[in-house]
Amino acid sequence: MYTAAIMKTELEASKGTRKLDMRIDNIQLVNVFTREIYPASIGIYNERIVAVGRVETEADQVIDGAGAYAVPGLIDSHIHIETTLLTPEALGEVIIPWGTTTLCVDAMEIANVAGIDGLLAMIKDSEKLPFRLLLEIPSRVPTAPGLETTGGVLGVEEVTQLLELDEAVSLGELDPSKVLGMKEEYLEKVLASLNRRKICNGHAIGLGVDDLNIYAAGHLSDDHESVYYEELLERLRLGIMPLIREGS
């Protein structure tokens, strides 16, 4: 548990009256708030950055950044880990060297095969990973009801339970038929996410402006299916955040 006593030690490290765990000198800081790049040092204590800029506090470990650029960790805002054909551990070896430190994962394939138990097992295993794993709770398990046999079913009750997890950040992508068709089960899943102050991911492939209006009215926050610039602009105009992916 994060306590006031722990916070006090971090403030002392920031002030310079407590020894840092690590200090990284001689870096070029890429400041995404001010859009500047400038020389700086970084002070780290208790696995937190507690000082940035001119940092001279003594540290247990001092690293020479050799003029390298320091940037915030990158976040992949939508990924299906299973389709990478890599385990989360192996995927970490690929993404960490390139600066990605957080994945927002819609593990719909795991859920279709192993249900809620599979998702909980993945979350438990993620504690050992070198990156942060956040969960977009799969909204379509099974994906095609009546046309497939799955190892698990995530109804409204199961989705609501999963949305209570600290690792859950959203309701995973909903395809247009579920929203435009006003299917009550999926509307209840959307409400379960909104009532927990979490967003709902979209999958608005091929939708024109009229249908996009309905989609936006259904509280779908984003879409990763824009192929042409005009599609991206249509989504922006309606407040739907376009996610740009290489596959599109």
Description of each model-found segment:
Residues D76-T87, T143-L154, S221:
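Active-site mouth loops of central-metabolism enzymes
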Residues G73-I81, L103-V105, L133-I137, V169-E173, ...:
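Hydrophobic faces of well-ordered beta-strands that scaffold small-molecule active sites
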Residues E173-S248:
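Active-site core of metal-dependent hydrolases
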Residues Y2-S14, G92-I199:
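Divalent-metal coordination cores built from histidine and acidic residues
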